[in-house]
């Protein structure tokens, strides 16, 4: 097993432990690899940041009930629904705050991972900066994810209020329901953080291979035991080799992707996927001088818009 494969294996062990909610003990569980000590810290900080935003959003919605506690009439509940959908939802700054938090997390994590992956491929061509393509991907995905997170929460809260009107529930019933909603709990924050470190890992692998002059192709590697309920079509992809900038065709599906867990994939193809990318290295390019390889890298970066 070469240096890059060993790194990817260690990285995949980290990801699986994180997904099992064990990342606070990762220092003892995962084989050493450069940069490992920082990744769990980034994930935990991101989780805490999400949890803080969810708590603040939760408090704002609960506080919105305070002006309506004196009456339980249908007219009051309808007015409450209007107040939430037209006022509180419009004033909700969760989306902007979450987008900024996610952009920072993804950039920090992808840079850290890309640095160690590129070093494992060819120490003579180090990682320097993210390509414009990946920077734009980080911004676009952070914005889309923030919209999804906010919309999901708003829809569930609106459903609670609508059901309350239909069932003649009291303000107190609504308050109790809102207090116990999983959309605001720490588990949602943790699940989101773990999902996004998975996305960051895939993006970092793809960025590293695109920037490395010696890497001309990429190989899909299925990873994960039977207990993870592996997808047959992902097993079928195992060993598939294509160009670095080409897309994989998911067997039995119309879906395509640049890498495992690509956000463009449906939830069905993304969630609990432990597949990784391996670089296919051209030994002739690896043998070029550092100056020649750096020139190739500069040209590649200039074209990665």
Swiss-Prot record:
Region (Disordered): 208-236
Bias (Basic residues) ranges: 215-225
Alphabetical list of InterPro entries matching this protein: Phage_head_morphogenesis_dom
Superkingdom: Bacteria
Protein name: Uncharacterized protein YqbB
Organism (species): Bacillus subtilis (strain 168)
């Amino acid at each position: 097993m070469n240096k890059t494969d060993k790194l990817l294996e260690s990285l995949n062990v980290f990801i699986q432990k994180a997904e099992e909610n064990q990342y606070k003990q990762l220092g003892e569980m995962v084989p050493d690899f450069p940069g490992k000590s920082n990744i769990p810290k980034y994930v935990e900080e991101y989780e805490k940041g999400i949890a803080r935003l969810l708590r603040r959003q939760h408090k704002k919605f609960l506080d919105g009930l305070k002006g309506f506690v004196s009456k339980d009439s249908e007219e009051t509940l309808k007015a409450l629904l209007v107040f939430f959908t037209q006022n509180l939802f419009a004033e909700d700054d969760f989306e902007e705050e979450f987008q900024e938090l996610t952009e920072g997390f993804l950039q920090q994590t992808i840079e850290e991972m890309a640095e160690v992956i590129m070093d494992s491929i060819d120490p003579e061509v180090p990682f320097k900066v993210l390509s414009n393509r990946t920077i734009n991907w980080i911004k676009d995905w952070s914005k889309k994810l923030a919209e999804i997170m906010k919309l999901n929460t708003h829809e569930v809260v609106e459903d609670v209020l609508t059901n309350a009107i239909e069932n003649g529930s009291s303000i107190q019933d609504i308050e109790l329901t809102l207090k116990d909603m999983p959309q605001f709990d720490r588990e949602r924050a943790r699940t989101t953080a773990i999902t996004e470190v998975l996305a960051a890992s895939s993006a970092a692998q793809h960025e590293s291979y695109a920037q490395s002059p010696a890497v001309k192709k990429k190989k899909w590697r299925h990873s994960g035991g039977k207990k993870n309920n592996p997808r047959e079509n992902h097993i079928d992809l195992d060993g598939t080799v294509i160009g670095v900038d080409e897309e994989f065709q998911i067997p039995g599906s119309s879906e395509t992707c640049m890498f495992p867990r690509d956000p463009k994939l449906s939830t069905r193809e993304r969630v609990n996927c432990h597949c990784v990318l391996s670089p296919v290295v051209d030994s002739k390019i690896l043998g070029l001088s550092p100056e020649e390889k750096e020139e190739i890298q500069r040209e590649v970066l200039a074209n990665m818009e």
